Amino acid sequence: MDILYLENLKQCPDFVETFKRPGKYFKVNIEGMELEANYEKYEDNMIHIVRTGNNLRFYHWIHAYLAYKYFTEQGKKVDGFVIELVDGKKEKIKLDRLIIREPNILKELRKLKKGYRNPGSHCRFCKIKTECHRELLKKGDLTVIPSISEKVLKDFEMMNVDPLEVINNRDEIDDFRSFQRKALFNMKSVFEDKTLKLNERKLPDDYIVFDVETYGNHDFLFGFLDNDEYIPFFFEDANKNDFEEMIEYLDNRNKKLVHYDVHDTKALRKIAKFRPELRSKIDKILEDSLDLFDVILKDFSFPVTSYSLKDISKYFGFEWRTNLNGFAVLTVYQRYLKGDKSVMQEIYDYNEDDCRATRHVLEELKKF
């Protein structure tokens, strides 16, 4: 168990991360559990650990505790820890502050022994998600299907409705409320293993796809895919507001913007707060934008257990070049800020793949 994914492991002890965070890894046995964590360096009896987050959290203490156990088992002296967080913020912890928390740390770790496979948002970054969800479906757990929750199933039960029977008749599905109807179509798609088109939607032919990478509150990379050309705009300095070139490019191209989820458009709109003179152009650029995720939620159902861009695009045959995800980008960019400039290419590749995957999905949807 990689303790850097503690919150995921608490939801499901079988969680297997898709991305291994940078650092020197070690394993340590705590009360019969083989746990894994990492550290940046061991220097002057101090263990240095790099994590994301703006403030020191309890899971950081657990991470430090595992490192303490590992180094003391190696016969090394430990006086304390340095936890480096977002934007170079460093928290220094003396060993006695950690030891005081040992009972609560062990209590939290013991919870991992009592866990069971429980599908949820934590599944997004799990390597065995597809196989696991398939097994759960065979056992009758319908909650792995998007839009199917315990509450939705309870509602069907109170209505004396068997959803597995209803999905055999499309006309019957149309009689339900909108959120129930979408849940039933998603279920039908999974069990029939085919994509379902629920509504007619005119999709654009001439457009620019864009995707934004964010670190903390800093939107540092705006990537655009115009036809087959990838055009990135990198804003390394969070205090510089030199957005003119990017806004002029979009304004001159005068094409519909396509994105996946609302984060990207929010990032563009946020620019107007720093540069109010660009507001009218930004509003014009975004007035006819298309959220492909919204299209998918409303107009299609797919035989997958997650509607993330990665899962939908992989279903349509898209191949990603990196193991990064939205959260992993934080840790990789953190390495860049610490001086490892070589990692930036991986972020560019990931951002470009996000754009190309979005276009790939959009073009596939046009075939239905």
Regions found by a protein language model. Give the residues of each.
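Acidic, Mg2+-coordinating catalytic module of metal-dependent nucleases/exonucleases
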Residues: 102-139, 312-368
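Generic beta-strand/beta-sheet core signal
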Residues: 210, 225, 258-261, 350
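N-terminal accessory regions of nucleic-acid-interacting proteins
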Residues: 2, 142-206
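Alpha-helix N-cap recognition
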Residues: 8, 160-165, 235-238, 308
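Polyanion-binding interface signature
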Residues: 216-219, 227-229
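Conserved DEDDh/DEDDy metal-dependent 3′-5′ exonuclease domain
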Residues: 21-32, 36-38, 43-110, 230-330
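A residue-level signal for conserved active-site and pocket-lining positions in enzyme catalytic cores
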Residues: 67, 126, 149, 211, ...
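Catalytic cores of nuclease domains that cleave nucleic-acid phosphodiester backbones
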Residues: 2-55, 59, 187-216, 223, ...
